[in-house]
């Protein structure tokens, strides 16, 4: 999860989009060249963001539900008013069910599923999690980012 202050959204989107090649709609770290990854991470390190990386042992679908429940708890108790999730049609319905249950009626914010070409801010958690999972020098590039590792148990 990456938290961006509303007043920084436009500036951060602009910083990220400058890394797009002509005709490219989004940045996905798995597909990028190393020099692009380095430049994007260097820019992310300059951004005023907060990131949380949730770690779970479960497999994808179950892990996603566990992570969403934890994220919902953070949202419910915090000041965040908008949640944007990467749109994966196979899990959207499940995501909505988990969020409705975990957020309850008291949260006044909104949430939506968007594709990464629709919302550049979705590139932030992709880049950060890719670097963390890659380890070594890539993980070291995250040292200037306000990053909290959150271990989750079932």
Task: Kindly label every feature range from the protein language model.
Residues 2-154:
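Phosphate-ester processing/binding pockets and catalytic centers
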